[in-house]
Swiss-Prot record:
Protein name: Small ribosomal subunit protein uS3
GO cellular component assignments: cytosolic small ribosomal subunit
The species this protein was found in: Paracoccus denitrificans (strain Pd 1222)
Region described as Disordered: 212-240
SMART domains given in the database record: KH
Domain KH type-2: 39-107
GO terms assigned for molecular function: mRNA binding; rRNA binding; structural constituent of ribosome
Length: 240
């Protein structure tokens, strides 16, 4: 089961939650869902150079809150915040309501599956050897602290007549373990020989608490820095 389904969808409400967090009646649901798709597509095109990883959309009462996770937030913010204000006004045209825009920096893009997949896809479009691109991504992820990573590329690799699939893995990637914090992403490289699909799985550890917000909370704590308090068992051992 875990080998076939999307790892993110399998772990929803276990250690991860949705990227669209709102509730609507049946008559409004379709329109709001279409708005979300348009907002995400627009941000991906406008902030292509910023390395956008995720776009989280929340809709409190008659408002819209958009949070962009990006590797280079300065590209979105611009000089003295001019570009982010322009982007906010353009996004407000999609919703027709008050819109709040937040930018969150991705401190370790080597551990973000979406950014890794897009990086490999861009290298393939520049005709870099797929084996070199895969191996470089795996080495960078393991160096930055990943417990395991798997990269899968499929298509007419190297311009071959027959499409095939190649994959490379290092460490462990437990797809059946629900408490495993596994980041997954898919990207596509457009080459003269056709489309090459790139899939990336990154295993970052285990989240023991049963909390859908646990993954987002862990990301926030990683950006704020380590807690000044040590592990409880270390304090108990020192006391003894």
């Amino acid at each position: 089961m875990g080998q076939k389904v999307n790892p993110i969808g399998m772990r929803l409400q276990v250690n991860r939650t949705w990227d669209s967090r709102w509730y609507a009646d049946d008559k409004d649901y379709g329109n709001l869902l279409l708005e979300d798709l348009k907002i995400r597509d627009f941000i991906k095109k406008e902030a292509k150079q910023a390395g956008v990883s995720r776009v989280v959309i929340e809709r409190p009462h008659k408002k819209c809150r958009v949070t962009i996770y990006a590797a280079r937030p300065g590209v979105i913010i611009g000089k003295k915040g001019a570009d982010i204000e322009t982007l906010r006004k353009k996004l407000a045209n999609f919703t027709g309501s008050e819109l709040h825009l937040n930018i969150v920096e991705v401190r370790k893009p080597e551990l973000d599956a979406q950014l890794v997949a897009e990086s490999i896809a861009q290298q393939l479009e520049r005709r870099v050897s797929f084996r070199r691109a895969m191996k470089r991504a795996v080495q960078n992820a393991m160096r930055m602290g990943a417990l395991g990573i798997r990269v899968n590329v499929s298509g007419r690799l190297g311009g071959a007549e027959i499409a095939r699939t190649e994959w490379y893995r290092e460490g462990r990637v437990p797809l059946h373990t629900l408490r495993a914090d596994i980041d997954y992403a898919l990207s596509e490289a457009s080459t003269p020989y056709g489309i090459i699909g790139v899939k990336v799985w990154i295993f970052k550890g285990e989240i023991m608490e049963h909390d859908p917000q646990a993954r987002d909370r862990r990301a926030t704590e990683a950006q704020d820095g380590p807690s000044p308090r040590g592990p409880r068992r270390d304090r108990d051992r020192d006391a003894r």
